[in-house]
Each structure stands twice: as structure tokens, then as C-alpha cells.
């Protein structure tokens, strides 16, 4: 589902900073992945690229067989809404909703009926135990 091949990212400025150097990664549908590393090692940059929030300089990124490069904002938002989810180390839940409602919220925006989204949210919460 997610395929990265030889991904490079450099932040240009007074001193160029080459933060991703030849990253290769494959993530299957439904697979849970943890990205860990020291401060400044490129984790946030990698997540921004995976989440289609930032572009890469070199390499190939495909999501469900579609090349992720130069997408319109509308198409990128559609991919993020339907295909990508993150759980951050320090995350913020919507305080007036319980855990199940927080997990189900993206499904609401996708138009999934309430019973189905609640069942899916509970299923995924059970996987976290």
C-alpha cells in the first residue's frame, strides 16, 4: 500500500540540511508501524512526506499504486482522509469526546454510517491492547 524507494529530502537555506538519505520502506494495508529515532533524525520529515504534507526531492513514493508527487491540494486531502492515519507520541484528543468517538471521528468525515464507524473504532481500539 505504501512504497518508498530511495527517498531524499534536503531543506535548503544558508546551510543545506539533507535529512532523508535514500529511505526505502514498504507498509502493507492494515499494518501498524512505529517510527523511532533520535531528535533531529528525520522522523517528522518522513511523517510529513508520508502524510502528503511535504514533498520529497528525489525517489518514488506510491500510495495504493498511485504516484504521490505534485498532487493538487484537493487530491492530497482526499488521500489523507481515506488512506492515512497517525497516532502521535504526544497527541491531543478532543476533550469532550471519549476514546471511541475520537477514533471514529475521521470516519464521520468520510461519511461512514454511525453504527459502522463505531464498530470499526472499537475494533481498532481492541487492537491497541
Locations of the language-model features?
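Short coil-to-helix segment of the ABC ATPase nucleotide-binding domain corresponding to the Q-loop/switch region
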Residues: 97-106
Amino acid at each position: 500500500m505504501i512504497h518508498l524507494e530511495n527517498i531524499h529530502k534536503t531543506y535548503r537555506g544558508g546551510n543545506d540540511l539533507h535529512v532523508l538519505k535514500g529511505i526505502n520502506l514498504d507498509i502493507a494495508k492494515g499494518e501498524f508501524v512505529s517510527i523511532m529515532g533520535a531528535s533531529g533524525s528525520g522522523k517528522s520529515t518522513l511523517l510529513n512526506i508520508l502524510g502528503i504534507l511535504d514533498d520529497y526531492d528525489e525517489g518514488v513514493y506510491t500510495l495504493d499504486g498511485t504516484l504521490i508527487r505534485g498532487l493538487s491540494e484537493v487530491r492530497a486531502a482526499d488521500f489523507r482522509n481515506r488512506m492515512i492515519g497517525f497516532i502521535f507520541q504526544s497527541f491531543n484528543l478532543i476533550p469532550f469526546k471519549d476514546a471511541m468517538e475520537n477514533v471514529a471521528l475521521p470516519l464521520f468525515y468520510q461519511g461512514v454510517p454511525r453504527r459502522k464507524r463505531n464498530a470499526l473504532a472499537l475494533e481498532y481500539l481492541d487492537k491497541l491492547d
